[in-house]
Amino acid sequence: MDRDTKLAFRLRGSHSRRTDDIDDDVIVFKTPNAVYREENSPIQSPVQPILSSPKLANSFEFPITTNNVNAQDRHEHGYQPLDAEDYPMIDSENKSLISESPQNVRNDEDLTTRYNFDDIPIRQLSSSITSVTTIDVLSSLFINLFENDLIPQALKDFNKSDDDQFRKLLYKLDLRLFQTISDQMTRDLKDILDINVSNNELCYQLKQVLARKEDLNQQIISVRNEIQELKAGKDWHDLQNEQAKLNDKVKLNKRLNDLTSTLLGKYEGDRKIMSQDSEDDSIRDDSNILDIAHFVDLMDPYNGLLKKINKINENLSNELQPSL
């Protein structure tokens, strides 16, 4: 590869683009104009349209010199991968990044299992309106930057009346880079915005599900309370029946007690009457008893009245016999 082409590859690095503070809002893109002047441009060829997709074999030809024979050979035989020595910007660090082993690649499954969102409230899981608005604003800013500033400037530089094909190729490369970066950045920001919006929608649905769960729990608690009330109502009804039976028994017992007291009152009254009658009867009984005892004494065959009468009769008989 010739020196000029290698220098062009170097200029694609970070030092080829910088902002000059000429105006506050005007972004100036440094092109190879500062390096290549028209009087010493190494390549001259007709102007090529911007919208075409030229191949390396048809875009321009390298002048065959002793310094660029290797580049012309690659150009004639089509595209071939260049050697590492043709890319001075690739160092050992970049090689290590390119040849990174698959074991160092981030594993999404390990990354997802590393986080636990169980203890995080929903309000922290949802994206704030500030974040969503910031993503939208950044997307608008980048679109405005590329679509209204960088891409039109690159197109304007490409369409200049200039016969330097190498410089036009750099302008075209800039234009393609700006378009690619703009499209990819727009898609990425749109994906990020969609992810945040979807996250908020899922958080809202999760809130609705949790609210519905809470309502169902309250309904379950209400149903359980009603069931307990029904069970308690049945028990209360049974208790009321038992209480009614007990009250009936108490009333019956009271009536029995009243009847018993009434009967006992009559018995006491009768007993008093009978006690008075028994006293009179006792007097009569005593007299009767005395009469019987007197009768028994009188009828005693040894000491009774008859024995006395007989004894008197015998004494009288004995007294009368001497007189006769």
From Swiss-Prot:
It comes from the Eukaryota. Its main location: nucleus. This is Inner kinetochore subunit AME1. Keywords: Cell cycle, Cell division, Centromere, Chromosome, Coiled coil, Kinetochore, Meiosis, Mitosis, Nucleus, Phosphoprotein. It is found in: Nucleus; Chromosome, Centromere, Kinetochore. Component of the kinetochore, a multiprotein complex that assembles on centromeric DNA and attaches chromosomes to spindle microtubules, mediating chromosome segregation and sister chromatid segregation during meiosis and mitosis. Component of the inner kinetochore COMA complex, which connects centromere-associated proteins and the outer kinetochore. COMA interacts with other inner kinetochore proteins to form the inner kinetochore constitutive centromere-associated network (CCAN), which serves as a structural platform for outer kinetochore assembly. Belongs to the CENP-U/AME1 family. Transmembrane segments: none annotated. Residues 199-263 form a coiled coil. Component of the heterotetrameric kinetochore subcomplex COMA, which consists of AME1, CTF19, MCM21 and OKP1. The COMA subcomplex is part of a larger constitutive centromere-associated network (CCAN) (also known as central kinetochore CTF19 complex in yeast), which is composed of at least AME1, CHL4, CNN1, CTF3, CTF19, IML3, MCM16, MCM21, MCM22, MHF1, MHF2, MIF2, NKP1, NKP2, OKP1 and WIP1. COMA binds the centromeric nucleosome-binding protein MIF2, and to the outer kinetochore MIND subcomplex, probably via AME1. AME1 interacts directly with OKP1 and an NKP1-NKP2 dimer. GO terms for cellular component: COMA complex; cytoplasm; kinetochore; nucleus; spindle pole body. The keyword GTP-binding does not apply. Present with 1630 molecules/cell in log phase SD medium. The keyword Cell division applies. One of its GO terms (biological process) is attachment of spindle microtubules to kinetochore. The lineage of its organism: Eukaryota, Fungi, Dikarya, Ascomycota, Saccharomycotina.
